[in-house]
Regions:
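Positively charged, small/polar-rich N-terminal and surface patches that mediate targeting and assembly
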Residues: 1-109
């Protein structure tokens, strides 16, 4: 079993809480950390934009990443949201196994 991190930015606390609660409740991820007051700079509409955002860091099995990303995309309010993932190479074995157990309910192998 391999595990991954999903990194997501959102515009406000309400949306962060909504996405986090939905994807945990639906067992697409084992847990989500929410970090507030992340300052983002990006190019949009032919200009540099700056916005205070919230960061979600979700943990899941790699096999579930595509389904989790799709679900986050369905809920997310942005036209082009930042939703990216990368594998966890190493970590606390007990924690990584817990991630696997908590996301088995998805039926995705």
């Amino acid at each position: 079993m391999t595990t991954s991190i999903i990194y997501v930015t959102v515009g406000d606390q309400k949306e962060a809480d909504l996405i986090a609660s939905k994807i945990v409740e639906e067992r697409l991820v084992s847990s989500v950390n929410i970090v507030d007051s992340v300052r983002s700079y990006y190019w949009w509409s032919s200009a540099v934009q700056q916005k205070e955002e919230f960061l979600l860091i979700a943990k899941t099995r790699t096999a579930v990443v595509d389904a989790a990303i799709e679900r986050i995309r369905d809920i997310h309010s942005y036209k082009c949201p930042c939703i990216v993932s990368w594998p966890i190479e190493k970590g606390n074995k007990d924690y990584l196994e817990w991630i696997g157990r908590e996301t088995e309910g998805t039926g995705i192998r």
